[in-house]
Amino acid sequence: RRQFLAKAAGEPHDFTAAFDELRRGVDLSLNLAYNEPWGQMQPVRHILGALLFEQGHIEEAEEVYRADIKLWKDNMWGLLGLKLCLEARGDAPEELAEVTKLFNERSSRADIVPAKTCFCAQDALAKSCCD
């Protein structure tokens, strides 16, 4: 529901309300009961990070991805987001190399290696596997 509200709130140039809905969605997702298969189709944190990154909020996107990696140790999606943030910053080559190595290991068995942490990002499909 929060993802839907965020999409509905996303005006062409002001994503403040959309980001607020996604942040609330992240908070709510932390209290979901554990189940397998996972009850979320798309983790809200991955959506928030991708859209923050896309809108140039690199530092906050990086915080989102670091929190995701802390919660779900070295997961491919969190590592991808952190890798993109570190590439954009360009000031941490050693950490970028380490994160890239981990991402490559974690994504080595994926059918499709994603370019973004959410295909909802505007340029996610432009750089996809299927071009």
Write out the residue ranges for each language-model feature.
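Structural motif corresponding to the intra-repeat A-B loop/turn of tetratricopeptide repeats
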Residues: 5, 12, 55, 89-90
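"A position-specific structural signal for the A-helix of alpha-solenoid helical repeats
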Residues: 2-4, 47, 81-84
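Terminal, low-structured helical/coil segments at or just beyond the last alpha-helical repeat
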Residues: 93-131
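TPR-repeat structural position
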Residues: 15, 58, 75, 92-93
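Amphipathic alpha-helical segments of tetratricopeptide repeats
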Residues: 23-31, 67-70, 104-108
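Single-residue signature of alpha-solenoid repeat helices
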Residues: 18, 61, 95-96
